[in-house]
A protein has these predicted regions:
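Membrane-embedded alpha-helical bundles of polytopic integral membrane proteins
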Residues: 1-220
């Protein structure tokens, strides 16, 4: 399980990072679009559709993303959209935690399918908008998620249910523990200090570099 996670992460990083640091935002936008299309195809398979139906689900997700791109939404704040989307996400997650796996089965299949495609579309739009805000901002968000997941995974395996007797969400994911939550939280706190210090050092180093370069240029003149 761990080896598969590592291999998958390395392959994705080899594709994602060059696109992320490319001067133009187009390659990164297309890479993320391909990932979301694959996710929509898989969502179609999980929803019980065959190959053709799942491809249609992926095409619908690509169409939504492409329309948003063509309309220029990747450069617009879209405050109302994010408020509604975020609110529905929180309410839906709270309901699923309460209802558990049996509650998921009570949702109509068509509604589950549409909700999944919309979630993938919003995820694409959010990530692409974050890239337009700057590489440093988006990279900090991605690393935060990676660190939280890694620390939670190892903390859960090492200390799961040693200090608390109640699992995190047994009705949804029986293997998750509160020790994993605290481990992920600790990892994020450490990352915050390290990232802030590194960011401050980098921002200070760049003006210093250009100052020295200007001084040398003045001396040569």
């Amino acid at each position: 399980m761990l080896l598969q996670r590592v291999i998958t992460a390395l392959v994705l990083l080899a594709i994602l990072l060059p696109a992320l640091f490319y001067p133009s935002t187009v390659p990164f936008t297309l890479v993320v679009l391909a990932l979301m299309a694959a996710g929509a195809w898989e969502w179609g398979r999980l929803s019980g559709y065959g190959q053709a139906g799942s491809l249609a689900v992926g095409a619908a997700c690509v169409a939504l993303c492409g329309a948003s791109w063509a309309l220029g939404w990747i450069d617009q704040p879209l405050t109302a959209l994010w408020i509604v989307g975020g609110g529905l996400w929180v309410l839906g997650a709270a309901w699923l935690l309460h209802a558990g796996v049996p509650g998921w089965a009570r949702i109509p299949a068509a509604l589950r399918l549409v909700a999944g495609v919309l979630a993938l579309w919003l995820a694409w739009l959010a990530v692409v908008q974050a890239r337009h805000l700057g590489v440093n901002f988006l990279l900090s968000v991605l690393v935060l998620v990676w660190v939280a997941d890694i620390f939670a995974y190892f903390a859960g395996r090492a200390f799961g249910l040693r200090f608390t007797k109640n699992k995190l969400a047994p009705s949804i994911s029986p293997g998750k523990s509160w020790e994993g939550v605290w481990g992920g939280l600790a990892g994020v706190v450490v990352l915050a200090f390290v990232w802030t210090a590194a960011d401050a050092h980098w921002q200070a180093a760049v003006p210093s570099f250009y100052s020295r370069l200007a001084q040398q240029g003045g001396w040569l003149l």
